[in-house]
Each structure stands twice: as structure tokens, then as C-alpha cells.
Amino acid sequence: MKKILLTVSLGLALSACATQGTADKDAQITQDWSVEKLYAEAQDELNSSNYTRAVKLYEILESRFPTSRHARQSQLDTAYAYYKDDEKDKALAAIERFRRLHPQHPNMDYALYLRGLVLFNEDQSFLNKLASQDWSDRDPKANREAYQAFAELVQRFPNSKYAADATARMVKLVDALGGNEMSVARYYMKRGAYIAAANRAKKIIGSYQNTRYVEESLAILELAYKKLDKPQLAADTRRVLETNFPKSPFLTHAWQPDDMPWWRYWH
């Protein structure tokens, strides 16, 4: 056991030494570089997808030229490098640091846009990919945070070059948030928790009126009211369904769990 621990410890030590050695080497190589040369080299590494080295060069630049405009831009570029390298937490931390240090920076719109992208492009599970990346199965917290980032961008910087794309992504995120609620409503219906299902359906109808889930929400709500022995409410809901979705298949047959795609049973 001691031999194993010694081997592991030695391996970790060697790894740490190698990392430190690389950092020291970068510091030595760049010691006479101007801020412009440092930034240009870091950009070359970033554009070549050498994200780890790009971050190292940005860090060296910021430590040597902390008051330069390149240092401020390097903070944003560091966040982008982490984002491209699938280092979500580091990217978000770098963005928050930039926002805290430079609340009035002219590139704040980009910082908000990048924060939204990091959250928006979170890795998908196998089932999501299998179902053509149905965003309703994403973590609703990530969806909400991404939406808030894009919304802040659009509200604060309506003329930003990123505003149009942010708005389009917000539409998709609203649909996803409605889908999250629908997944829960379906689950409650399947389990016979009709009050809870009705509440979720009403939330979709009230808060996500422009999503593709309203039609099914009305069908779930109608059936839930029937199961709860509330015929008048069920009839009222059906009239709303008929008015807004006159060709709905739910008008000829009531909602049932079999209407759910097979993969949702594992959600």
C-alpha cells in the first residue's frame, strides 16, 4: 500500500512540476515581449484551438500589463477560451470577474452574450441527443439563467450586434422552459396526481402562451378536471381547446400517457 501511495504521490508531483515548468518556460520566453506581441501570440493560440496555452499567455499579459486595454480584453478572451475548451465553470467565473471589475466596459454586451452561450450550450444527455436534442429536458435552472443573461443583454443593449441572436435564443429557451413544465405535468398525470398535473398545465397556459405545449396542456387540464370530478371546469377547458385548436387530435380522443414519446418514460 505504501508503495502504491508513493507511486501516486510521485506521479502527482511530477505532473505539478511539469505544469509549473511549462508556466516558467512561457514566462521566460515572453519576458521581453511587448503587450502587443503577447496579445497577438495569445490570439494566435486561441484561433488555433490551443486554449490552455492561450489562457497562460493571457494570464502573463494581465500580470505584466494590468492597466492596459489588452489586459481587460484578455479577461474576456480568457472566458471565451474556457468556453471553447468546455470548461463551463471556469468560463462563468472569468465572465463574472470581468463584470465585477469593469461594469461599464464597452464590451459588456459581449460578456452577457458569452454568459448566455455558456449556459445555453451546456452538454446534452444521451436521451436528449437521441431525441434530436429536445431542449425541454435540459436543466430548467440552466435554461432560466441563460434566458436571464440574454434578456439582460437585450434590455441593456438593444442595438448590440448580439441582440438579434440573443432574442432568437430566448424564444427557444422559453419553449424549453414550457417543455420542462410539460414533462412534469405528464409525469403527474401518469402517476394519477391530477391536482398537481392541473396546476402545471395552468402554469404553461398562463406563463408560456406562445409555446408548442399549450394545446397539450389544455388536453391535460380537461382530463385532470374530469378525473377530479369537476365537469364544469372540464367543459370550460374544452371550449378553450376547441376555439384555439379546432383541429386538435385531443378533441377526438382524450389525452393519455401513450401520447408521450417512448423516451420520456426515462425522463
Swiss-Prot record:
**Which residues bear S-diacylglycerol cysteine-type lipidation?**
17
Q: Superkingdom of this entry's organism?
A: Bacteria
Annotated organism of origin: Neisseria gonorrhoeae
Q: What is the lineage of its organism?
A: Bacteria, Pseudomonadati, Pseudomonadota, Betaproteobacteria, Neisseriales
Query: This protein is called what?
Result: Outer membrane protein assembly factor BamD
Q: Which GO terms describe its cellular component?
A: Bam protein complex
Where does the record place the N-palmitoyl cysteine lipid attachment?
Answer: 17
The entry assigns this protein to a family as follows:
Belongs to the BamD family.
- Subunit-level organization: Part of the Bam complex.
Q: Name one Pfam family in it.
A: YfiO
**InterPro entries of this UniProt entry?**
BamD, BamD-like, TPR-like_helical_dom_sf
Membrane topology (UniProt): Lipid-anchor
Q: Which Gene3D superfamilies does the entry mention?
A: Tetratricopeptide repeat domain
